[in-house]
């Protein structure tokens, strides 16, 4: 008896399983879940219940329609013979009609007798129909299962065939690769043989080329002497022609000269053609000569020129044609083809060009100029300039920019005069604006720069003067920025610039010396003159400013001011008491000793200098420091040197410009204006300027933008030209250099000066084996674009007093980019040095571990030749390396394969014991040979 589940039966009846379960429960069939099995008796009970509930004699359901759909697959061969699987869907629809045999009009009594047999027959027919339906469903399920089984078997068969074909293809490919490798090896051997032959041929060709070059040099020297002689004769002839042109009415007699004309020789023609490169398009005398008859190629030049100088109007009005003007008559008055006419025409051009004197042009060469522009200025073809540069060893294109030095050398080589010029420079207008200002110069406060070695107390000295604690706020207690302050004293205002003393901040100290009037040289009494002290003295002397020496830490017990004076005298800083010009003042930043004397000496020097500057004028000054603030944008600390800077002024600073939106003093308070010698912080520039750039106030914002754009373009072109000039030199250096490891880094700092100093310090760490490669250096926080650049260049990112934003941190974590944060320059340099040390290849050293003497040699089966040895010193270990000495001469170096002691394989044998030693891949040993055993150890290297 067939059975299926409630869910399957519900899907056949197109009902939900829940509805079918309710009907089964009402029919007395206990089924709890859709997965329960249904038997044929359960279905009959359900059918009986439904018939009873709907009634059999009411006639409500007279017609039942059953729809059946089945899907099967058949395999059909197509035209190519391949078997294709076709899906076949069969739909069947059957309608069952219940017929009522009751005849209308018959009596009530007779009706049961007639209708009862009909109802039983109908029930029996219905049950038979349902049984047939169930059987058909079961048969359909069996067909589907068999079709699925056949499909699975067919799929497995196809997979097996595909695997067999793949294995056969792999074997075929392996065989093909083996054949190709054999062919490649044969080709490589042939290529090596060809390379050797080619190298020999090249060596022979080089030797021949050297001999030819020597011969060519001798020939060129002789040709140059001949050329000079011909040029001298041509100049003399040109002078004679000028003299004849002074009297045009005089008829010249045709007379054959004694020596041949310079224009008749090919070499002379080439020289004459070279001389005409600088000649204008039309010159007096050349155009009439072109119209002269060309009939007699051997005629005297004076006879030809006489007709042209006579000024024949018919000759002047003659139309120029592409052919010969003489009607095709050749040199011997015979008609000739196009070749003869061309030679005649060339001869005429040579005769015209010979007496022309080369014109020397004064070429104005800017900082950068392209090859095409340079050729245009010299009135020659660009190909001539390219040839000249190729002779100098530079491969250039017509649009390639040249730096000023290279361009001037080319101009001189071409026989012209080179003049340094900056034409069309919009900065010329700035001088006019400044020179147009007429303002009264008034006394101004001195600008004093405090310089000295690191940790000698510069910032602490300023702390006491300012009554502030600046040094405590600096990272590591060392200054890493230029600090600008102005202090009001009873005798006037003094502006102080505090420069870093660390060796990395050389550029900052140089900027501080250039912007200052007086230098306070700080030297610790207990430390003396140090390297940065000497450097500060050089900067001060180069700037030509007076030096006031402050001997700090004078209250310490181990202070020795006299030693400091002697060391400074050796550096040509002589104290006043020794007859010099520099006052020496011992001071203490803790007790305040000597501070007043120091300020008095500074103000005394300022009075001697008579410092003055205009006040009611547009401001000019110097950019001390610059940074990119996240909230405020580009911020620059500037020192006003003359004039008055106000909020709203248009400022030009280097390659940037902008309008001053806000101005703060050193205490962070807003101010409206700043006079001479006052440091302020300004906002509103278009970009971060370079520290050390000069700034000025202009009246026109448009002009300021133009000048800034011009400066940026000039800087970019100059940089590009210098890079191009250095490329050829670097090619050979890179070819000769070995395998050099690169350590790419990206630097982001809070201010321009710190970024510059950190980059210089890290680049100094480069060695012959490891090179620090600066991918990018900038000012501001670490952004996502910086991290993406680090991903592309595989660089590490160093942040100095800055941090990465959220997006940059997320990108760095996802791509394993190293982000390093520092606030002390010492730490950044030390950690990068340690990282570079880790990149160095370890050093391999040999360490001797023992020696042995071979006393006997025997051959063991399955082992080979064994050295019966006595360990004289140290020990011998398995797999250690050895040197075989015979008569104190090393004849072999190899590895010990095994060591045996009393037929036992051991790891080591110490001094004083005998053992058998098997040498790896070596058997030529004799009695009396010595064995030295050693190990190779790798030792980490440091920078």
Curated annotation (Swiss-Prot):
Residues forming coiled coils: none
Region G5, annotated ranges: 588-590
Keyword GTP-binding: yes
Location of region: G3: 498-501
Protein name (Swiss-Prot/TrEMBL): Translation initiation factor IF-2
Keywords: Cytoplasm, GTP-binding, Initiation factor, Nucleotide-binding, Protein biosynthesis
Region feature Disordered, mapped onto this chain: 57-85, 97-232, 245-358
tr-type G domain mapped to chain residues: 443-612
InterPro entries: DNA-bd_dom_put_sf, EF-G-like_DII, IF2_assoc_dom_bac, IF2_II, IF2_N, P-loop_NTPase, Small_GTP-bd, T_Tr_GTP-bd_dom
One GO cellular component term noted in the UniProt record for this chain: cytosol
Region annotation (G4) ranges: 552-555
Pfam family for this entry, one: IF-2
Subcellular location: Cytoplasm
Compositionally biased tracts (Low complexity): 193-204, 280-292
Residue sites binding GTP per the record: 452-459, 498-502, 552-555
NCBIfam families: IF-2, small_GTP
Function: One of the essential components for the initiation of protein synthesis. Protects formylmethionyl-tRNA from spontaneous hydrolysis and promotes its binding to the 30S ribosomal subunits. Also involved in the hydrolysis of GTP during the formation of the 70S ribosomal complex.
Domain of life, source organism: Bacteria
Stretches for region G1: 452-459
Sequence similarity: Belongs to the TRAFAC class translation factor GTPase superfamily. Classic translation factor GTPase family. IF-2 subfamily.
